């Protein structure tokens, strides 16, 4: 499996989810299966089927998270030397050159991305356009409405 970049905050979030799945969700579903079995005939036992489906989901998610964490390259942007270059984990303030509107994004791994929170996937068009550029540079981004040009106003490692 290839190395997956993830921020320290993203890795901590995955570890917390894994802990919850193993210590809360898994024991709960095992108990639910046990209670459903105690009701007798399993062929028409909806509670049993639901619990078994839930168990399959939980076990699959545990394996998925463990795989991601084992392949993760955890990057803590607060440890970067002060600079002006856009890299994975950096927070970038942009200004739309056409409208003057400002927007701030942090470049994160795919599991962390949430555009509503300003977290953009390293593989997204905007992140690919920004990586390697410096404060004061312009970046062209292919957006659904056409090409947009942004000026990189500030780069922070927070």
Swiss-Prot record:
Keyword DNA-binding in record: yes
UniProtKB keywords: DNA-binding, Transcription, Transcription regulation
InterPro entries for the chain: GreA/GreB_C_sf (IPR036953), TF_GreA/GreB_CS (IPR018151), Tscrpt_elong_fac_GreA (IPR006359), Tscrpt_elong_fac_GreA/B (IPR028624), Tscrpt_elong_fac_GreA/B_C (IPR001437), Tscrpt_elong_fac_GreA/B_fam (IPR023459), Tscrpt_elong_fac_GreA/B_N (IPR022691), Tscrpt_elong_fac_GreA/B_N_sf (IPR036805)
A GO BP annotation: DNA-templated transcription elongation
GO molecular function: DNA binding; RNA polymerase binding
SUPFAM superfamilies in the cross-refs: FKBP-like (SSF54534), GreA transcript cleavage protein, N-terminal domain (SSF46557)
PROSITE patterns xrefs: GREAB_1
Gene3D superfamilies: Transcription elongation factor, GreA/GreB, C-terminal domain, Transcription elongation factor, GreA/GreB, N-terminal domain
Top-level taxon in the UniProt lineage: Bacteria
Repressor is among the record's keywords: no
Protein task: Necessary for efficient RNA polymerase transcription elongation past template-encoded arresting sites. The arresting sites in DNA have the property of trapping a certain fraction of elongating RNA polymerases that pass through, resulting in locked ternary complexes. Cleavage of the nascent transcript by cleavage factors such as GreA or GreB allows the resumption of elongation from the new 3'terminus. GreA releases sequences of 2 to 3 nucleotides.
Entry's family note: Belongs to the GreA/GreB family.
NCBIfam families per record: greA, PRK00226.1-2, PRK00226.1-4, PRK00226.1-5
Identification of the protein by name: Transcription elongation factor GreA
Organism of origin: Polaromonas naphthalenivorans (strain CJ2)
Gene that encodes it: greA
